[in-house]
Amino acid sequence: MDKPAKRIVMIVGPTAVGKSDLGVYLAQQLHGEVINGDAYQIYRHMDIGTAKITPEEMQGVPHHLLDIADPTVAYSVAKFKKAATAMIDTVADRQQLPILVGGTGFYLNSLRLNLPLGGKAPPTAIRQRWQVALATNGQSWLWQQLAQRDPDAAQQIAPANTRRVIRALEVGELTGRRFSDQPQPAPLFSTLVIGLTTDRAVLYDRINARVDAMMQAGLLAEVEQLLKTVPADAQAMQAIGYKELVPYLHGQAELANCVALIKQHSRHFAKRQLTYFRNQMPTHWFDLVAHPEDKNAIVTLVQQWLKQR
């Protein structure tokens, strides 16, 4: 099978490791444009809590798929895949390199693997039965059920990714064929994945400092303004940094406790992000916090990859 003609670079990793800065640098060095791959930066009026890149930080580099949805509207991976695919085509047709930057792994993998989305949902009874079994027996047991029925699929799906484990089990029941034997769509793009990480203690310190900076920059006021028009149970308001402040604004919690929760949830999320990218995406890892000079090695890596046929 020939490789897809259009090539894209993805910059992935946990929160607070410098993905946005690297995206700008690569775009400047490689005639690129940045496409957002963060599930919450697509929302308007959610700037501080999502660490959305500012116009000044863009340094003139075009950025796409930021501020494209109202916070009252639910967004989905299917909508993202459609919008991102169209934007990649537009950028590539301009002879520019599409550079996707973000930490929402499933959004990015939907593009990398050309995952089929928006199809017919499995019957509720099957899904509920496996969800009950998961709640009763745990994720290790659930994954073992998949491993017994479809070892190839189990090798590709982490036990912690219970949603996809259940999906694989459902498909097997629905079709009578193993999930791994289902016809897979051909990738639309050839993809190089660059991952950023750093020492865990350093990462957690950076996360804590970032949350403090967000609070000083006016995150509380941003959340308060959103709540004037956006329900607290809206999808957008489930973002870390937003949902934790709602109880304080409703007079139900102390501010210091809410901020501590933002830090805790952000650290836990960073750990989950790293687990996902390590298990689900073939990634070239770099630590630009400890070795900022390695950004030039990343440029060289991308240049060599672009020359491959």
From Swiss-Prot:
The record marks 104, 127 as: Interaction with substrate tRNA. ATP binds at residues 13-20. Gene3D superfamilies: 1.10.20.140, P-loop containing nucleotide triphosphate hydrolases. Substrate binds at residues 15-20. Its cofactor is Mg(2+). It catalyses: adenosine(37) in tRNA + dimethylallyl diphosphate = N(6)-dimethylallyladenosine(37) in tRNA + diphosphate. InterPro entries: Dimethylallyltransferase, IPT, P-loop_NTPase. One of its GO terms (molecular function) is ATP binding. The keyword ATP-binding applies. HAMAP family: IPP_trans. NCBIfam families: miaA. Monomer. This is tRNA dimethylallyltransferase. It comes from Lacticaseibacillus paracasei (strain ATCC 334 / BCRC 17002 / CCUG 31169 / CIP 107868 / KCTC 3260 / NRRL B-441) (Lactobacillus paracasei). The lineage of its organism: Bacteria, Bacillati, Bacillota, Bacilli, Lactobacillales.
